[in-house]
Amino acid sequence: VAGYRGNTFNAPAYITILSEEKDNYLINAGFMAENLVLKLEEMGLSSCFLTSDDSEMIKKVLLINSDLAVATVIAFGYGKKERDTTKLDIHSPSNVSISNKAGHIAPKIAATALAFDSDFNTPYNFDDEYSDPVIADAVYAASLSPSFLNHQNYRFVINGTHIYLFNQLDNVVPDDDNLLGLGAAMLNFYIILASKYSGIGNWRFDTSDIKADFKNPSDYTLVAALDI
């Protein structure tokens, strides 16, 4: 009913997030859930998004009486120390940094492979003399977000102060898990920008006014945009 790759996931505690089943509700749930995950990390706790295959059964088992759907379940507790990696440190909304963290992380796609300049034919140049260091940090922060099997199906296209987010659905990552991970990446990207720039807009899902040719592969779809 809830687990990871078809297996049960035993943890001392769980967080269940419920939602109305509206447009983009899973992306929104992933966005909110990642905020909770970062708070758990701040408290020294490890966590994991679980696949939720049967909302009604989960509510029945947990004695939840609600018309809302189970959007996601997060398992958390004190994890075993394995090796050093990196994490986001959120000291306040205006003070966010990336630091070393003790724990385990599976290999992920490099941040440099996740971002493009204006279109998919031009990789984003992360060299300090060419790139905006805040945007570079935001892409890196997004790359640290939870992603099912670390597939990281999202891509960023950066055109000056305009950020375009693309997503790929595939046969490996369940669509629900894909969208939850997309929301988590959006949160990490956003909080880095918001910590350095004042007055930035919010992610928007209505991209019908955007007519640019991003030269994106046919399996990548524009899902959101953000103006700095």
Regions found by a protein language model. Give the residues of each.
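Acidic, surface-exposed loops and disordered segments
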Residues: 1-228
